[in-house]
Amino acid sequence: VALINNQLLPYPYYAKPGAVRSPAQILQWQVLPNTVPAKSCQAQPTTMARHPHPRLSFMAIPPKKNQDKTDIPTTNTIATVESTITPTTEAIEDTVAALEASSEVTESAPETNTDQVTSTVVE
């Protein structure tokens, strides 16, 4: 008695070798006595248990390994950004109101100082 255990079968089968049996009994299969057959097999006679055939929609077919591939060249689409240092000259005016520290009330024009400041701006 040989045990047939296939991943497609809902439960394992025992098969008796055909050399021991008569030609009329060679094609007979016996179900394990301690298992419950699947519902699709219960309506069939117990002398002949058939293998359930999975539908093609459940079968996975792997793709061919030697498929024609179009090689797409890889290009670097990210441009390198170089920083440019641009000197910028800004005029900063400092307005200081000059107040005279005298007891007299006088009006004086505010003094304006202009300084040149150079800064670097990275663009």
UniProtKB/Swiss-Prot annotation:
- Region annotation Disordered: residue ranges? 100-123
The entry's cellular-component GO terms read: extracellular space
Query: Polar residues compositional bias: what residue ranges?
Result: 103-123
Residues bearing Phosphoserine are 102, 119
What keywords are assigned to this protein? Answer: Glycoprotein, Milk protein, Phosphoprotein, Secreted
Instruction: Report what the protein is called.
Output: Kappa-casein
- Looking at the record's lineage, which domain of life comes first? Eukaryota
Question: Which family does the UniProt entry place this protein in?
Answer: Belongs to the kappa-casein family.
Query: What Pfam families does the annotation carry?
Result: Casein_kappa
Q: Enumerate the residues marked as the site Cleavage.
A: 58-59
Please list the residues annotated as glycosylated.
Answer: 74, 84, 86, 89, 95, 102, 118
Q: Which gene encodes it?
A: CSN3
Describe its function.
Answer: Kappa-casein stabilizes micelle formation, preventing casein precipitation in milk.
Where found in the cell?
Secreted
Q: Name one GO biological process term.
A: lactation
Origin species? Capreolus capreolus (European roe deer)
Where does the UniProt entry say this protein principally localizes?
A: secreted
Organ and tissue specificity: Mammary gland specific. Secreted in milk.
